[in-house]
């Protein structure tokens, strides 16, 4: 397979991980005599423990969450699902549209792994993300409080009895604004310390000339956090040519329910689903996953034509035979086994292939050109397409009913309905407090409301309506859009500075990603010798991506020179110097 360095990294990682996994699984099986033990893989499928390898385990947990989202969405008639998994230190986002989107090379902790993985985009934003005021901006993440010291409200103290945590975390912000209730936690929360730290942060803003109340400052932190997570979802949807408004937002993870409405509103998504097991949905996903084997065969670099496609018949059949034999050995009959053929294709001279499922009409060229145009916005007329690799995926379909575990979900009723004050959109709102188990099928709850669960809290914003559906799933519908206009001003503030910094930075980073994936130049696609940046109308630097910094000085001079020579630029114009 092409990619010597990636294969070397993968072999090294596997050599470290697999012996440890084998020892652990051997000990586990000794405690479970007579049991059949299957392991979750990063590709989204199960495999017998004896065949499990370390390099296939890297993202197995998050992949199980994506599988759960897909199965739940299909069960309720939603073939397109965005997975939004917000935990303590990070948020994982994914997209499903009838097929799992897989990548075959990724980088984790600086190590390149060549193995099938469900495409999951991870950002450093979670309930533990630190919220600080620095250099005139409100910052959320990427640093995290972790489990020790954790958020300020957890109240962990050192030997002298002093609070370990010094910085606010997103969880503290939600508590301060009333979106979390202390009585819904299994231990006491230190709300007094959170309030004091929030007031001191607002005072820092005032010393910089920004007259923010503690509540406005807190809401600014959430606005920045939500923007980062919404941008991550755009990376796996809009940036790849998909209209995110057509998708269901499947929200899970311990912190996801507090932010689901805000994320949906920013993206224009109309419906949210929160499963009863949302706090542990990855574990649930393992229970409903299929058994999957994936194999590949390097082809070399054959041009895409009828003759070369015909020559692939034998390697495809060999891979299918190997995969079906393995899946049958795990107890599946042929009626429950499905096979799929795929090809890795790319334009000659480029670096990154596109993996395509075999088209129904067999026209790989048209499928490739269409996909390339959707991803990158153009096609290369006259440049030949080459085949790098053929792949086969063999699936043993599970008979597990995704709803069969739900009957075991129990939670205590809170009795008489309560109300609490929640700060939202610049004002305090009286919100209903309900337990999920208090809601009967078909009953509707209009926001603002807090819906409590044993493993999470759901904040229903004004303009959203919540209701219980089949299998105790909670559906949130966006029923009232806010059509108020945003008032822009030339006066900067700590919130807007960070919001626009993230937006412009994202543009520059996307420019670099597309440039690398589509480039023919070795300097660009392998040495990464380039820089991308955004400039204002007079050529001043606005934002740059973390590329080679040496280019940035000359780049600004070049942009200003082009502006001087071409003063009548119009939208859509492109200049090459």
Name what the model sees in each region:
Residues 78, 88, 141, 145-147, ...:
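C-terminal, non-catalytic interaction/recognition modules in large multi-subunit enzymes and RNPs
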Residues 1-62, 150-202, 539:
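Gly/Ser/Thr-rich active-site cleft segment
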Residues 32, 73, 237:
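Hydrophobic pocket-lining residues that define ligand/cofactor binding sites across diverse proteins
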Residues 1-3, 41-46, 63-65, 89, ...:
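Short acidic loop-to-helix transition motifs that present clustered carboxylates
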Residues 13, 19-59, 76-80, 97-118, ...:
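N-terminal glycine/serine-rich phosphate-binding loop of ATP-dependent small-molecule kinases
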Residues 53-60, 64-175, 261-301:
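Glycine-rich phosphate-binding loop of actin/hexokinase-like ATP-binding domains
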Residues 44-45, 67-69, 107-108, 234-238, ...:
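A generic local structural motif
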């Amino acid at each position: 397979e092409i990619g010597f360095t990636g294969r070397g990294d993968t072999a090294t990682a596997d050599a470290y991980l697999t012996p440890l996994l084998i020892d652990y699984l051997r000990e586990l099986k000794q405690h479970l005599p007579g049991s059949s033990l299957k392991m979750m893989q990063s590709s989204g499928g199960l495999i017998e423990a004896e065949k499990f390898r370390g390099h296939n385990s890297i993202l197995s947990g998050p992949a199980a969450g994506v599988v759960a989202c897909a199965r739940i969405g299909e069960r309720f008639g939603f073939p397109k699902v965005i997975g939004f998994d917000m935990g303590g230190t990070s948020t994982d986002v994914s997209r499903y549209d009838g097929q799992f989107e897989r990548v075959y090379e990724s980088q984790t902790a600086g190590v390149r792994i060549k193995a099938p993985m469900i495409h999951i985009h991870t950002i450093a934003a979670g309930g533990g993300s630190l919220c600080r005021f620095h250099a005139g901006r409100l910052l959320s993440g990427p640093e995290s409080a972790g489990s020790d010291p954790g958020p300020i409200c957890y109240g962990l103290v050192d030997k002298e009895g002093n609070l370990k945590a010094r910085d606010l975390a997103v969880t503290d912000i939600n508590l301060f604004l009333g979106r979390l209730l202390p009585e819904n936690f299994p231990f006491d929360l230190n709300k007094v310390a959170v309030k004091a730290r929030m007031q001191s942060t607002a005072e820092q803003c005032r010393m910089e000339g920004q007259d923010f109340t503690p509540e406005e400052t807190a809401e600014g932190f959430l606005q920045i956090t939500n923007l980062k997570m919404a941008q991550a979802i755009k990376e796996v949807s809009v940036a790849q040519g998909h209209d995110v408004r057509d998708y269901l937002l499947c929200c899970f993870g311990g912190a996801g329910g507090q932010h689901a409405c805000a994320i949906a509103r920013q993206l224009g998504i109309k419906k949210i689903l929160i499963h009863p097991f949302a706090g542990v949905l990855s574990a649930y996903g393992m229970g409903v996953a299929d058994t999957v084997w994936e194999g590949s065969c390097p082809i070399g670099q054959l041009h895409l034509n009828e003759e070369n496609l015909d020559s692939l018949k034998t390697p495809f059949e060999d891979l299918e035979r190997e995969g079906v034999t393995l899946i049958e050995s795990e107890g599946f009959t042929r009626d429950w086994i499905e096979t799929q053929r795929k090809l890795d294709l790319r334009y000659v001279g480029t670096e990154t292939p596109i993996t395509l499922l075999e088209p129904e009409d067999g026209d790989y060229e048209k499928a490739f050109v269409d996909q390339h145009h959707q991803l990158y916005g153009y096609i290369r007329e006259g440049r030949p397409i080459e085949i790098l690799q053929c792949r086969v995926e063999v699936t043993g379909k599970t008979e597990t009913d995704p709803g069969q575990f739900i009957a075991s979900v129990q939670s205590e009723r809170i009795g008489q309905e309560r109300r609490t004050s929640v700060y939202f959109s610049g004002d305090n709102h009286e919100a209903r407090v309900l337990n999920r188990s208090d809601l009967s099928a078909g009953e509707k709850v209009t926001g603002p409301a807090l819906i409590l669960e044993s493993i999470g809290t759901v904040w229903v914003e004004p303009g959203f309506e919540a209701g219980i559906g089949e299998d105790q799933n909670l559906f949130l519908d966006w029923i009232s859009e806010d059509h108020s206009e945003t008032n822009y001003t030339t006066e900067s503030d700590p919130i807007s500075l960070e919001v626009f910094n993230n937006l412009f930075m994202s543009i520059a980073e996307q420019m670099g990603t597309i440039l690398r994936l589509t480039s023919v130049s070795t300097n660009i696609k392998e040495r990464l010798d380039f820089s991308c940046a955004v400039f204002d109308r007079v050529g001043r630097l606005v934002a740059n991506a973390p590329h080679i910094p040496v280019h940035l000085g000359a780049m600004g001079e070049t942009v200003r020179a082009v502006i001087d020579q071409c003063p009548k630029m119009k939208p859509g114009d492109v200049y090459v110097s």
